[in-house]
C-alpha cells in the first residue's frame, strides 16, 4: 500500500461527437501509440456502421453491449498453506467497465473483417444481442468463479 496521499481520479471529458463519457474512455482503451484521432475515427466509423446495419441509436447499442459484457464476479489467486486457490470475488464497478472495454477491444481485434471499424461494429452488434467472443470471455470468467465457489470463504 502506498504511504502517500491517495491520488485523485482524473476527470474524463465526454467525447466531442456523442457527448458520452464511456465512449471517451473506450477511445482511450482503443488508442495505440498515443494516436487518439485514429482511435476516434475507428470508433465513429464503427458506430456509423452499427447505425446502418441495425437502424438503432449507435450509442444505445454501445452501452447495451458494454453492460452485457461487464462481469459480476472473477477469480483471484490466493495462497493458503502451500496451495494456490482461485477465490471468487465480486468485481468493483470501475473494474467491471474497464474489463468490458478491454474484452470488447480484444474480441474486435481477433475478428476477420477487413478494417478495424467493421470488426468493432460486428462485435458491438453481437455483444448487444448477448453473442460474440467478448460475451464468451465473460461467461468463461463466470464459469471459473462458479466452479471455485467452494473457496469463497478465503476472502481477501
Curated annotation (Swiss-Prot):
Q: Does the keyword Membrane apply?
A: no
Report the SUPFAM superfamilies cross-referenced here: Ribosomal protein S7 (SSF47973)
TM annotation in the entry? none
Q: Which GO terms describe its cellular component?
A: small ribosomal subunit
Task: Quote the CDD domains the UniProt record gives.
Answer: uS7_Bacteria
* Pfam families associated with the record: Ribosomal_S7
- GO biological process terms, semicolon-separated: translation
Q: Which InterPro entries match?
A: Ribosomal_uS7 (IPR000235), Ribosomal_uS7_bac/org-type (IPR005717), Ribosomal_uS7_CS (IPR020606), Ribosomal_uS7_dom (IPR023798), Ribosomal_uS7_dom_sf (IPR036823)
UniProt entry keywords in alphabetical sequence = Ribonucleoprotein, Ribosomal protein, RNA-binding, rRNA-binding, tRNA-binding
- A molecular-function term among this protein's GO annotations: structural constituent of ribosome
Quaternary structure and interacting proteins, as annotated:
Part of the 30S ribosomal subunit. Contacts proteins S9 and S11.
Q: What does this protein do?
A: One of the primary rRNA binding proteins, it binds directly to 16S rRNA where it nucleates assembly of the head domain of the 30S subunit. Is located at the subunit interface close to the decoding center, probably blocks exit of the E-site tRNA.
Family in the record: Belongs to the universal ribosomal protein uS7 family.
Protein name, UniProt field: Small ribosomal subunit protein uS7
User: Native species of this protein?
Assistant: Nitrosomonas eutropha (strain DSM 101675 / C91 / Nm57)
Amino acid at each position: 500500500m502506498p504511504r502517500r496521499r491517495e491520488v485523485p481520479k482524473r476527470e474524463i471529458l465526454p467525447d466531442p461527437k456523442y457527448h458520452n463519457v464511456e465512449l471517451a474512455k473506450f477511445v482511450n482503451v482503443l488508442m495505440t501509440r498515443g494516436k487518439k484521432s485514429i482511435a476516434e475515427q475507428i470508433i465513429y466509423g464503427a458506430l456509423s456502421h452499427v447505425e446502418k446495419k441495425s437502424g438503432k441509436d449507435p450509442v444505445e447499442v454501445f452501452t447495451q453491449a458494454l453492460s452485457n459484457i461487464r462481469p459480476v464476479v472473477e477469480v483471484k489467486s490466493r495462497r493458503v498453506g502451500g496451495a494456490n486457490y482461485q477465490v471468487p470475488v465480486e468485481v468493483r464497478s470501475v473494474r467491471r467497465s474497464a474489463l468490458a472495454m478491454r474484452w470488447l477491444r480484444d474480441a474486435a481485434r481477433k475478428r476477420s473483417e477487413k478494417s478495424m471499424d467493421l470488426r468493432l461494429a460486428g462485435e458491438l452488434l453481437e455483444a448487444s444481442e448477448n453473442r460474440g467472443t467478448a460475451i464468451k470471455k465473460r461467461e468463461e470468467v463466470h464459469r471459473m468463479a462458479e466452479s471455485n465457489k467452494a473457496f469463497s470463504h478465503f476472502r481477501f
